[in-house]
Amino acid sequence: MTRKILVTSALPYANGPIHLGHLVEYIQTDIWARFQRLRGHDCHYVCADDAHGTPIMLKARERGITPEALIAEVGEEHQRDFADFLIEFDNYHTTHSDENRYFAELIYSRLNQAGHIDRKVIKQAYDPKLEMFLPDRYIKGECPRCGAEDQYGDSCEACGATYTPAELKNAVSVVSGERPVERESEHYFFRLQDFEAMLREWASPEHLQAEVANKLAEWFKEGLRSWDISRDAPYFGFRIPDTEDKYFYVWLDAPIGYMASFKHLCERKGLDFDDWWGPDSTAELYHFIGKDIIYFHALFWPAMLHGAGFRKPTEICAHGFLTVNGQKMSKSRGTFIMARTWLDHLNPEYLRYYFAAKLSASVHDLDLSLDDFTQRVNADLVGKLVNIASRCAGFIHKRFEGRLGETLDDPALYRQFTAAGEHIAELYEKREFSRAMREIMALADQANQYVDEQKPWVLAKQEDQADRVQDICTQGLNLFRVLVVYLKPVLPRLAADAEAFLNLPEQCWADAKTPLLDHGIRKFKPLMTRVDPDRVQAMLEDSKKTLQPKGEPQAAEAGPLTSDPIAEQIEIGDFAKVDLRIARIEQAEHVEGADKLLRLQLDLGGETRQVFAGIKQAYRPEDLEGRLTVMAANLKPRKMKFGVSEGMVLAAGPGGSDLYLLEPHQGAQPGMRVK
């Protein structure tokens, strides 16, 4: 039965280029959508640029252009990069569109009429020079708790404290350098708590991965709160109906971009929008997203849709983050790789295959190990897959005028290959791509083993074995064709080249069941070359250059004491007041809604403490668990908006990704005092 499937990826923000971290999601989604089409389903894949918000407005101002000009320029770059990575959208749009304005206003109006929108006055930081309210990230100053300088307006990267911009000492606007003042403003809030019963029922394994469903259970336990959906002028976005200076917050109209892009497709293709988005739609709707935006997609988005009379998603498909060589992407190491830099040096299908070989249906992070990448692509795609065709095609072309035989040498082996198709299809369907790639490469091993055992190059020297040679090579090329069909969602360009070589029209999944017999093929040309390690290294070097700041060469960086001099002297008794203890990190996890914090559960040797640490940009939670560190154990517990922090872990470094937790030497035990 043909299914109706609509697939989306999260919208890339329109103020910068696409990098490999972004591509994890778009490649994953594209593979899944291509697979559905290959199976004969009516599948549409839409996306758009997320084109609103303060960062876009300020970047355009900095460059002396309009926001519209900036998003148009970035949008063209995004679409070029996606096209060159063979991401096949049915429609790519922008949230700065008539369709998006229409749906944003419609959804807001329906929610407002139903009583799900509140208004209340809040206090915010205001830049008197630019005459604009400032998001927390655009305010910096000294932490009111530990005194660390150059901290953002919502939390301290040094000690993990959270606070309001008004509490920040010596605060300045990052944009103008002026000291912000506090002003009141009326904001609009979406009453998420009105939909708790519906969300609890919807948030099941049918719609969410188990890890995500468990996370939602935690949020339900904490209680759902109203969500601020408005921003004050000046702001680049859509004005809220019946207001003079209030705009929809970017996170309200961003997911609505899925609807807007599909509406744009409907207008181009003559599709019925309500068949896909109406409350009684039988179509399937899948959102592929990163695990950092689950709150928006698994709570706010289905609540907005339900409250406005639209259907809810069939499934939210979350994935983890990308690391390179086991570490966060790094500009200094050249591993913060832009899509265009990769394309300048390497085949995009190399990366598509490697990501597929590592992706599963879980939210675990994915590591791009460049040594493993080189070895795996060369072994699997060149040494196994393409090798089958190159070993057999020459005999068919030279000895049999490019014509396959009328029979297979081993029909049972061919049936084994085609029978594997349903299991491989199940793995694709479940987004278990890594398992699918292993199954396909196991078949490729069998195909190569078959050719090795039959030795057509030996038989070709015997005149009475000509028919057998033709049948063996016909068998090998048919096995190759089956594998290409199975890999077509991952390697669309190689598949198209293979179809041309085999003199075939575009293949679908079902075509693999029928062998090619008594069929003319074209002369074989190499379908893929080996990854050259020198080109990988050149790409890394280019990444370093691409990300270097422009302008005059900078003087050598001063040492830490220059920018952060030693504090005033204290008495030994002052230091003795701080009780430093060894602690083992039992558990570490992201804090939803916090850009810089991790929640740590620390074992003090008989007592467990919860600490919020501003180290999210420097460490992955799974890398911390089980490690020893040092904590200040006698600090008064501090109530934060995410919970109570019962101490502080110690780290060195200026902040951000350059933070280094203190670790004791071997032999130290949890609870030991640091003297």
Swiss-Prot record:
It is an enzyme of class 6 (ligase). Its EC number is 6.1.1.10. Zn(2+) binds at residues 143, 146, 156, 159. It catalyses: tRNA(Met) + L-methionine + ATP = L-methionyl-tRNA(Met) + AMP + diphosphate. CDD domains: Anticodon_Ia_Met, MetRS_core, tRNA_bind_EcMetRS_like. Binds 1 zinc ion per subunit. Residues 574-675 form the tRNA-binding domain. Homodimer. This is Methionine--tRNA ligase. It comes from Alkalilimnicola ehrlichii (strain ATCC BAA-1101 / DSM 17681 / MLHE-1). The lineage of its organism: Bacteria, Pseudomonadati, Pseudomonadota, Gammaproteobacteria, Chromatiales.
